[in-house]
Amino acid sequence: MRRVVVTGMGAITPIGNSVDEFWQGIKAGKVGIDEITKFDTTDYSVKLAAEVKEVKLAAEVKDFDAKNYMDFKAAKRMEKFSQYAVAAAHEAMKDSGLDMAKEDAFRVGVSVGSGVGSLEAMESNHKKLLEKGPSRINPLLVPLMITNMAAGNVSIQLGLKGKNINVVTACATGTNSIGEGYRSIQHGEADVMFAGGTESSISPIGIGGFAALTALSTSTDPKRASIPFDKERNGFVMGEGAGVVVLEELEHALKRGAHIYAEITGYGCSSDAYHITSPMEDGSGAAYAMTSAMKEAEVKPDDIDYINAHGTSTHHNDLFETRAIKLALKDAAYNVPVSSTKSMVGHLLGAAGAVEFIACVKSIQDGYIHPNVGLSETEEEMDLNYVKDEGIEKNVDVVMTNSLGFGGHNATLIVRKYS
């Protein structure tokens, strides 16, 4: 089977619009959660979200500006979730050193997903429909809002003509997208895949819908809103952004002298077949994804140096994922450090797994495991080695990252230091 390595990374996140900014924010324990600015929340119980900061002044280079990554005309024909994906893909390509002039474009593919697509486009055009009639609907509404346009726009902007897929598995989208990119290279369907996830759903209907599910935190304190594994957790905080990585067949990467960050060695998936929003209570579905990934990677539970948990800060997810980790890793579960990146960036939905995968690769590169920022006290059954207060500096060889999505989707990746 062909080996698959990571040679480039790109990120747009609530704590930084590049991988370096994101990782420096992670190491500093920066929390990207603040009051929602995209719309008036007067009538909403939820006041907080982790937003990518909008452009206010041209000099504020930390703010996202689509025109830094594409021309104005292209940007106007994309919704934010597509813009974020293209921006992250551009950074990943630059980071990888891949020169498409020297590549067979049909051997370079895309696996980028979005859990939702554009709710904002649907909302604004629904308003036009009600107020002015169907003739005023934007003729580009459908290609603006559908989830596959993130992958489509990455392909168009970067000239990638190979396999192009759009995975939609709710909150597992980013991890599944990277996993399917990995499989595509393993099985010879591509030599290079741009893989990841993207999301921009902080809108009235997005916040309103998740709030109606009672899935969102109603905390008014940004530091205590997204607190995975804490006994006072009361829901997730919606985030937005994108993460894209360049996956490459090992010999292809070596031949062109690429810098190799890490190697993917295992990918596992399962379905709970249980409930539309809740994970399986005993954790058996997620545990199967973990054990499948470990089996393919040929690693034992004792070999896992770090688990980047799905850790959403909801009561059910964090408890049931804890049970799943215990089922999958047995006695070793109590020793391995566990943390959730969502404690700092919120829940990026379809982008979550991709951004968290980048955090895992950086953990391997830097020998650093970030904490669960805001974690104060856990409950009785939550007795794993959750990283608390300060990060851990240690050699990190093998990392497991988990994602669980509405509908019972479970996905796990094993990424390890390249040797």
Which residues fall in each region the model found?
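Conserved small-residue
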Residues: 8, 26, 89, 110, ...
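ACP-dependent fatty acid/polyketide chain-elongation machinery
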Residues: 1-74, 251-261, 358-372, 416-419
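Phosphate/pyrophosphate-binding loops at sites that engage ATP/ADP/AMP, CoA/4′-phosphopantetheine
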Residues: 92-104, 253-258, 290-306, 328-332
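Active-site-proximal alpha-helical scaffold in enzymes
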Residues: 85-98, 147-151, 155-199, 237-258, ...
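Conserved beta-ketoacyl condensing-enzyme motif
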Residues: 6, 27-169, 198-207, 301-317
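Glycine-/small-residue-rich "gating" segment that lines the acyl/pantetheine channel
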Residues: 131-138, 179, 183, 199-255, ...
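Condensing-enzyme catalytic core mediating Claisen C-C bond formation in acyl metabolism
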Residues: 3-7, 34, 221-297, 306
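Acyl-CoA/ACP chain-elongation machinery
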Residues: 189-234, 267-281, 311-318, 335-385
